[in-house]
Amino acid sequence: MTSASIHIGSYTSTTNGNTTVVKAPTKESLSTCLSATATTTSPLDSIDIYINTSDLPTHYDSLALASIVPSLSPGGVLSVHVVSASSSAASNESAAVDVVNWSAITTSFVLAGLKAESEQRDGSGGRVYTARKATASQSASSAAATGRINLGGAKTKVKLSLDDDDDDQLIDEDDLLNGGGGMLAPPPTIDTEARAKSNLDDCGGRKACDNCTCGRAEQEAADAAGGPNEQQSKSSACGNCAKGDAFRCAGCPYLGMPAFKEGEEHLVLKLNDDV
């Protein structure tokens, strides 16, 4: 069984002859300490990392553990020993233990792909964290659990065509024109002769039209013959009958009627109240 012991920072101790001791005096040297040692070329069954409590915040690198794990054999154990001083310096380190970030060690296990197994504490404030590297079978089962499921069926390719119009409902253009499909009704028939006859009677001018049917021609003929003139029978001395109520006198026969043009008195007199 081969093993290695890594001493970080100011930690010093004696080990047995079967263990390779590697020094990592600085935080930066932790990731390369094993690769720089020729005696650790073969995979190790166990790696023990020792560090004093006072050096943990400044000398332990959570990312460096990932560079050490490749030297560990599958199923091998890695332990981090955080040692507290046992002599007169214990009183000085006891205060430092309370502010130590212990999660840095467990975080380094996760980043290195190790499975944490145990955490032990001693009476002096030290702790030992143990983790194990996965075996080849465990790595394969983990990859299979997270991989895609293959049902073994033959792969089929689906082809889509943009010219596939089998599902389109086509409409006959002739049905839109003749109304056979019930979508458009034929336009109504216009009686052009009736429209022409109605347009012949147009008394909008100063005189009645030749084909007058509204009675204006008869009225004009009676006026020209000296017959009863409704305009002459209804008038006032003010002479403002055609201008509207604002200009009419109190005895004007056209009070309450709209203004009119000279010569159109007969049209105003024929207006009937709708109320």
Curated annotation (Swiss-Prot):
Region (Fe-S binding site B): 238-252
Positions of region (N-terminal SAM-like domain): 1-147
Residues spanned by motif Cx2C motif 2: 249-252
UniProt keyword Transferase present: no
Sequence motif Cx2C motif 1, residues: 238-241
Superkingdom of origin organism: Eukaryota
One GO MF term: electron transfer activity
GO biological process assignments: iron-sulfur cluster assembly
Alphabetical keyword list: 2Fe-2S, 4Fe-4S, Cytoplasm, Iron, Iron-sulfur, Metal-binding, Mitochondrion
UniProt free text on domains: The C-terminal domain binds 2 Fe-S clusters but is otherwise mostly in an intrinsically disordered conformation.
PANTHER family: ANAMORSIN
UniProt-recorded name of the protein: Anamorsin homolog
Species in which this protein is naturally found: Thalassiosira pseudonana (Marine diatom)
